[in-house]
Amino acid sequence: MIINESYLNVADNSGAKLLRVIRVMGGSRRKWGTVGDIVVCSVRDAVPNGDLKKGDVVKAVIVRTKKEIRRPDGSYIRFDDNAAVVLDKYNEPKGTRVFGPVAKELREKGFMKIVSLAPEVF
């Protein structure tokens, strides 16, 4: 569960390394987000000479969470870190590569480009 002020690792090569959540999108009283939810974030750490710099406000989609996700078949999945992929204004990934595994719930939410770029889908 990702709430406001949560930190997220960046799972792509957009230039950001660490994000802090400003807002979980989708409703005025939305408390938390999970895999596949879009969040507004501030860049807290970035690579030198990258497209993004510290302080930039970006949209991102959550791709991994430490809190387990319950699937319709009754199974659960959880990851070792909280991670997100930075999005552009068309909700497409800003980077050209995705690092680490992603949850298959992204396919159901319509983020096919991220699923196709990911090395593993769980």
Curated annotation (Swiss-Prot):
GO terms for cellular component: cytosolic large ribosomal subunit. Signal peptide: none annotated. GO terms for molecular function: large ribosomal subunit rRNA binding; structural constituent of ribosome. Keywords: Ribonucleoprotein, Ribosomal protein, RNA-binding, rRNA-binding. It comes from the Bacteria. GO terms for biological process: translation. CDD domains: Ribosomal_uL14 (cd00337). The keyword Ribosomal protein applies. SMART domains: Ribosomal_L14. InterPro entries: Ribosomal_uL14, Ribosomal_uL14_bac-type, Ribosomal_uL14_CS, Ribosomal_uL14_sf. Belongs to the universal ribosomal protein uL14 family. Binds to 23S rRNA. Forms part of two intersubunit bridges in the 70S ribosome. Part of the 50S ribosomal subunit. Forms a cluster with proteins L3 and L19. In the 70S ribosome, L14 and L19 interact and together make contacts with the 16S rRNA in bridges B5 and B8. PANTHER family: 50S/60S RIBOSOMAL PROTEIN L14/L23 (PTHR11761), LARGE RIBOSOMAL SUBUNIT PROTEIN UL14M (PTHR11761:SF3). This is Large ribosomal subunit protein uL14. It comes from Thermosipho melanesiensis (strain DSM 12029 / CIP 104789 / BI429). The lineage of its organism: Bacteria, Thermotogati, Thermotogota, Thermotogae, Thermotogales.
